[in-house]
Amino acid sequence: MMKYELKSTSGMARRGRLTFSRPQGECYVETPAFMPVGTYGTVKGMTPEEVKATGAQILLGNTFHLWLRPGQEIMKMHGDLHDFMQWHGPILTDSGGFQVLSLGKLRKIKEEGVTFQNPISGEKIFLSPEKSMEIQYDLGSDIVMIFDECTPYPATLEYAKKSMEMSLRWAKRSRTRFDELANPRALFGIVQGSTYEELRRESVKGLINIGFDGYAVGGLAVGEPKEEMHRILEFTTPLLPQDKPRYLMGVGKPEDLVEGVRRGIDMFDCVMPTRNARNGHLFVSDGVVKIRNAKYKNDTTPLDAECDCYTCKNYTKAYLYHLDKCGEILGARLNTIHNLRYYQRLMAQIRQAIEQDCFDEFVVEFYAKIGKEVPPLHLKSE
């Protein structure tokens, strides 16, 4: 069970709360929320306790990868994904659609589903909307995503239309199988339509007719210019139900989160804070620190004076530079702790600004600190 409560707004920005019924009682996710990505049932290099300490309340797991390894049977032997990875908060799982897109020539898309070559074993396997619902049921996902085709960019109007229409048919099949399983959790629809406004409108209408607990905006952050992403968000979010959460999939940089919230988005996920951390790319209050730069070799200041994370409270830039130079695992861990905490602090600041109805002022201050211009906002009136 999942409930969404819209608590306050500031412009298009929304402050809300998701409530989940878990075996240990009710769990809350304050929105706008950022979900760290635990592809294989782990946020890389972090224990669940460490992830929780950054302020994260919900994680994302990857249906496709967990299906291939360790598989449904091993998952069921433990109970579900929560028991397997020992994270007892809510988990959202994606449906596998994006991973299938990324396989490129290794996959063949038909009406029934997708046949592809297992990237691990080389064998041919088949994933359908029904199978995706069954895997996510066994994972015990608190938020299940429908199986869709993530339309690649660029796409012709003809291709994008066919792709969106098939995704709608798959959405209906996902809903039917989800209900047949008597899954008590939440099911989210995914809006497709590439960069074509009329297709996005048609997709939203079709999904609302089927009926979902929340709505994701998919098919963005797949190579399109930022201006295009902003334009499609500005067009799409006003069409979505006010009383349901909105999720922007696979996004993104700190400024992308701010821009998503400006356009009415409630939930985000991205590998960026964790992947960038392992590459020495660290997010700080006034921009970015690339810790591999030799200028940090003798720098005895903390990474970010405004940050309260374990890394910033205990270590200097010189130490983090040293760990990275030596290839020490601890360096990647400390970097990850910081980046995840940065993202959660950013979301907390966003929520507070919406509560105080001063989100526009927050946006101006945020961009001033990182030395960038505030992108224009051209919201469509419906």
UniProtKB/Swiss-Prot annotation:
One of its GO terms (biological process) is tRNA-guanine transglycosylation. It catalyses: 7-aminomethyl-7-carbaguanine + guanosine(34) in tRNA = 7-aminomethyl-7-carbaguanosine(34) in tRNA + guanine. Keywords: Glycosyltransferase, Metal-binding, Queuosine biosynthesis, Transferase, tRNA processing, Zinc. The active site is at D94, D269. Its EC number is 2.4.2.29. It is an enzyme of class 2 (transferase). Residues 250-256, 274-278 are annotated as: RNA binding. Zn(2+) binds at C307, C309, C312, H338. Its cofactor is Zn(2+). HAMAP family: Q_tRNA_Tgt (MF_00168). Belongs to the queuine tRNA-ribosyltransferase family. Homodimer. Within each dimer, one monomer is responsible for RNA recognition and catalysis, while the other monomer binds to the replacement base PreQ1. This is Queuine tRNA-ribosyltransferase. The gene is tgt.
